[in-house]
Amino acid sequence: MTDCTKEQMVFPFYKQKSLTVNFKGGDLSSDGGLLFVRQLDERWKITEQLAGVLDDRRDQRYINHELLALLRQRIYQVGAGYEDCNDADTLRNDPILKMCCDQSTDASDALASQPTLSRLENTITVRELYRIGELLLEFYFAKHKRAPRKIILDVDSTD
């Protein structure tokens, strides 16, 4: 029988500790795929670019989570299938999500709460949404050598 599985994989983006994944069991997480999303984000700098088009209008005296960390948490949660901000309270201490957001895995160092992420979403202006759209288009065109023959927009307004 052919063994096509690597023994282990290393994810260098997490600077606080060595992060090595193996396939031998032990502590398991249903969100391990986020490690690959984070690795791609590290290469393509998508969340960093998104943070660059948003103005952080929060009072700096009361900030516990940097804008980039909030964006990563929210985007990675959606990428893992947690579409609602209310999932943030359940995921605040998820070790994989914390690593992907460059947060310590210590229990006392939680990710942002649902109200914090909801405030982030509700403070984005129309102008910033437009800039986000432009950025995503630029990113798309940079990754494709030629324009596609057609683009299908699947707009589904149902839940």
Residue ranges and their predicted role:
Residues 1-159:
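Dynamic "connector" segments at or just before major functional cores
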